[in-house]
Amino acid sequence: YTFAENLYEVYCIKNSACYFLIPSILLGIRRWRIMMVSSKGRYALRVMIYLAQNDREELIPLKEIAENQNISMKYLEMIVSLLHKGNMLISGRGKKGGYRLARKPSEYTIGSILKLTEKTLAPVNCLEGGKVTCEKAGYCITLPMWQKLDGIIDDYLETVTLEDLLEGRV
């Protein structure tokens, strides 16, 4: 995937991690920086996309989602619980129980989904939680660069919606 005239690329390794590769033009250096999205974040996106693709009034059983997405029931239960608590899914119990999106696909940004599932999207630890936590921040020469990169990542992920992914607009 590319954004803003090839300013970054995303690579996914099968059954492993996805990496955002940020080139030197953004970092002011001559190498790539890697930001990893966990399997929990990637699976949450897959679940949300599956539910958006199968948008219907009735609830979709967890077993159907697990089988279709090849995610273990135990791991999937944890992910949908997180998405439900974050008001992204509507759930129901019983024979006709399951899950569906709480809103239209156009109303979910990828950033909002990943922020719910990931501990942080910050490219460095000192920016976790949206504030600078490093004791060296007062004299850190690289801090402005990391803050700018954090803003670029956040801005981009907040512009891409589930609908954009479904329509191939990324």
What feature does the model see in each segment?
Residues 67, 84-85:
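Alpha-helical residues within the helix-turn-helix
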